[in-house]
Amino acid sequence: MKRRSAIALILVGFAALSYSPQASSETGWVTLFDGKNLDHFNAIGDANWRLEDGSVVADKGNGFLVSKDAYADYQIRAEFWVDADANSGIFIRCTDPEKVGANNAYEVNIWDTRPDPSYGTGAIVNVGKVDPMPRAGGKWNVMEITAKGSTFTVVLNGQKTVDAAQDAKFASGRIALQHGQGVKDDKGVVNDKGVVKFRKVEIKSL
């Protein structure tokens, strides 16, 4: 009887681990988005976010998915897909969850068509330039961001785009996923056709 009870307890323990909604296969990582729901995020702005085929997608409007919790030192890993002309990004340490911008957060940019290395894909706006500038459009990508104290590193598809950049303006805050409107064309019309998708977002406290 004792042996059966011990086996039963072990099986129950394994079942609990298997069904944990926050569990990740790697030690220390917590899933914020797994393609199924947006329980860990609030939407602000007018971007038309919706769940499609295991991803959260937007192709119109200007807005953010803002994490419900704030974080200080961590690694974040996100899988994303964008059109070549899409304007997106991952904002970290956002101090105002109702109004996200580069003036109150660190903006890790995803924008292939911006020629300025301060704003290119993989750059941290006003903190870390990217050179040479990678291209993320038309494919799935993995972006890893490390924020520890005043030091920031960005890795895109295994290649460092920002290496140990320094800035101390913001110590903690929310995480925000962006769908932004593009630039105006010669007729003054804003490009609003870029598709942005996120299918997995994980975080690990440091």
Show where each model-derived region lies.
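Hydrophobic h-region of N-terminal signal peptides that target proteins for export
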Residues: V12-S20
